[in-house]
Amino acid sequence: MQNFLKGFEVRATILQGTLVALIARIPPYVEGNGRNTIQELIAIKNRTRKSCGYLKKYPINITSKIKEFLKSNNLSLDYIPKNNERVLLSSVSNIAGGGELINITDKVSDNIKEFALDVLASIPGLYSGGLDLVLRSFDDPEPHVIEINTFPVISLTKYPTYGKTSNPAKVLVESVIAQHQINNNEDNQYYIENADEYLKTLLIFLKDN
């Protein structure tokens, strides 16, 4: 049996020792306007999701689990939420199930960022990964790790629903090339503007690995 952890789920994406982003994952929900039913609001939200190249693959499907979740909160698909009233459709923060992504990198404390880097650095030979954390606040003094993924889904940081985007592929490719060029002392090197910063970050990371 697993212990229940109070808080919200965050994915920390680390590539070659660089913390690219911290993304909060939130369950699917709709926001009322005082006119449309939950079912109609889901259809409206799905049209919005189609405008995103990533989210359009994952519409909010009205499943039996969503109906059961609404029923457990004394609601149904026919309920008309008040203006600005937010209604959760599930307790699961899964993008495939209609969840959303918020880039909270700039809001999270440096201690949490260092914690994520230290956790990944504690695994020998692992320089890139996706850490699933549970936080109670943006400056939680005791964050919890619930999962470590050796193959991070970098698209999560590229296409957040809210907040600034990032370019994880650029970070990964350029940091690998910078490392390769310094290790092999190549004459005709590919110019990377942030090469020194990539190498410095990786060396700091490796000291803890």
Locations of regions flagged by a protein language model:
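Short beta-strand-initiation
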Residues: G7-E9, S128
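Conserved ATP-binding module of the ATP-grasp superfamily
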Residues: M1-G7, V20-L22, P27-C52, K56
